[in-house]
Amino acid sequence: MENNTFSSKSINLLILLLLLCTFLCQTESALPSHQELVITGRRMMSYYKPNTDIGTPSSTSDRGGGGNGRRLMSQMDVGASSSGQGGGRNRH
């Protein structure tokens, strides 16, 4: 009886060890190497353009507005609202 429980415990331990080794090997292979990180960093930096503005529209706007295409709400002529809920200027 003792021999049977010893063998089942050792089999369970062996399976646990194999699973642990497999997990560690898979995790390590999923991480990029140092050389791959350097190449990726250089590739990302090649897209970087230090003399350009990010997210600003061009100054030649087809909308005919201001120089940069942005208008404040105070500059817009809203007019009267057709819903009667306000939002326009009262014209008395």
From Swiss-Prot:
GO terms for molecular function: LRR domain binding; receptor serine/threonine kinase binding. Residues 53-62 have a biased composition (Polar residues). It is found in: Cell membrane; Secreted, Extracellular space, Apoplast. Transmembrane segments: none annotated. The keyword Disulfide bond does not apply. A motif (SCOOP motif 1) lies at residues 53-67. One of its GO terms (cellular component) is plasma membrane. Mostly expressed in seedlings shoots and roots, and, to a lower extent, in leaves. Residues 50-92 are annotated as: Disordered. Keywords: Apoplast, Cell membrane, Cleavage on pair of basic residues, Membrane, Secreted, Signal. Brassicaceae-specific phytocytokine (plant endogenous peptide released into the apoplast) perceived by MIK2 in a BAK1/SERK3 and SERK4 coreceptors-dependent manner, that modulates various physiological and antimicrobial processes including growth prevention and reactive oxygen species (ROS) response regulation. Belongs to the serine rich endogenous peptide (SCOOP) phytocytokine family. This is Serine rich endogenous peptide 11. It comes from Arabidopsis thaliana (Mouse-ear cress). The gene is PROSCOOP11.
